[in-house]
Design a protein with these regions (language model features):
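Predominantly long cytosolic amphipathic alpha-helical stalk/bundle segments
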Residues: 65-159, 170-182, 209-245
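Amphipathic, non-membrane alpha-helical segments in soluble helical-bundle scaffolds
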Residues: 41-45, 96, 162
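Residue-level recognition of hydrophobic positions within alpha-helical transmembrane segments
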Residues: 46, 52-53, 188, 218-220
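Terminal intrinsically disordered, low-complexity tails
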Residues: 1-5, 242-245
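Hydrophobic side chains within alpha-helical segments
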Residues: 40, 53, 59-60, 148, ...
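Alpha-helical transmembrane segments of polytopic integral membrane proteins
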Residues: 48-55, 61, 81, 165-168, ...
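Helix-termination/interfacial motifs at the ends of transmembrane alpha-helices
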Residues: 12-33, 142-217
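Hydrophobic membrane-targeting segments
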Residues: 2-73
C-alpha cells in the first residue's frame, strides 16, 4: 500500500509541469509547517550541542596529551633521584595532564603515610587505592559529554524521520486541499520530508564519528594511567625493599 501511494505521489509530481517551486533554504523553510520547523530547530540545537562537546573534548585531550609528554620524563627523573616533593611539584604544574592527576594522588598518599624511613605494606596498599580512585575520577572527567555524542548520533536520524513523516502527511494534505495535483500541491510537504531527513543525517554522522574517535582516545588514556599507576607502585615496592636492607 505504501509503495502504491509513493508511486502515485511521484506521478503527481510530474503533472502540471508549469508549477514553479524554489528549493533554496529560505523557500523551503517558509513552505514548512510549524511541526516540521520544530523538528529542524531541535536538530539544530542537537548539532550545536554536539559541536560544543567536540570542541571542548578536543581541546581537553590535546592539552592532556601535550602536558603528559612533558610531565612523564620530568617526574621520572625526580623519582629516580628520590625527590618525591619535587615530583609532586612537577605534577601540580601540569594540572591538565591525566597522568599528573593520577600520579599526584599516589605520591601524596604515599607521603602522608610515610612516618618513618621504613615503608610498610599498608603504605603501599593505601597508595595503590589512591591511584585507583584518582584514575576512576580522571576517567569520568575525560568521558564527560562524550556519551551525549552517542545519544545524538543514535537519535538524530529518528528525529529527522519524524519530520519526514510530518512532511509526507503535509504533502497529502496539500493534495487533498488543492484543486490540482501537480508539483505545487505537494512541494511544501516533500521539501519538509527531504530537509528533515537530510538534517537528521547531517547531525548524526559527525556525532558518531566524534564519539568513536573520542572513545578511542579515552581508552588510550586509561591504558596510560594504568601503566603509570603500576610503575609508581613498583617504585614504592623497590624503595621499600631498599629501606629494609
Amino acid at each position: 500500500m505504501l509503495g502504491v501511494n509513493l508511486f502515485t505521489l511521484s506521478s503527481w509530481l510530474f503533472q502540471e509541469g508549469e508549477a514553479t517551486v524554489g528549493f533554496d533554504p529560505v523557500t523551503m523553510w517558509h513552505a514548512m509547517a510549524w511541526p516540521a520547523r520544530t523538528v529542524v530547530i531541535v536538530l539544530f540545537i542537537m548539532s550545536c550541542w554536539s559541536i560544543g562537546v567536540m570542541i571542548d573534548r578536543w581541546i581537553a585531550y590535546n592539552a592532556a596529551r601535550k602536558q603528559s609528554r612533558l610531565f612523564a620524563p620530568a617526574v621520572a627523573g625526580a623519582l629516580k633521584d628520590g625527590k618525591i616533593d619535587e615530583a609532586i611539584s612537577i605534577a601540580e604544574q601540569n594540572k591538565r595532564s591525566h597522568l599528573a592527576k593520577v600520579v599526584t594522588a599516589g605520591l601524596q598518599e604515599f607521603q602522608a603515610h610515610q612516618v618513618s624511613a621504613e615503608i610498610s605494606g599498608e603504605t603501599i596498599e593505601a597508595s595503590k587505592r589512591a591511584l585507583e580512585r584518582a584514575a576512576a575520577i580522571v576517567h569520568a572527567e575525560l568521558k564527560r559529554g562524550v556519551s551525549s555524542l552517542a545519544t545524538t548520533g543514535s537519535t538524530a536520524p529518528f528525529v529527522g524521520l519524524f519530520g519526514t513523516v510530518l512532511g509526507i502527511i503535509n504533502a497529502f494534505r496539500g493534495i487533498a486541499g488543492a484543486k490540482s495535483t501537480g508539483l505545487a500541491a505537494v512541494a511544501g510537504g516533500i521539501s519538509e520530508a527531504l530537509v528533515t531527513t537530510a538534517a537528521g543525517l547531517f547531525v548524526a554522522i559527525p556525532a558518531v564519528w566524534a564519539y568513536n574517535y573520542f572513545t578511542g582516545k579515552i581508552e588510550s588514556f586509561d591504558v596510560e594511567m594504568d601503566n603509570s599507576s603500576s610503575e609508581l607502585i613498583d617504585y614504592f615496592i623497590k624503595r621499600s625493599s631498599r629501606g629494609k636492607k
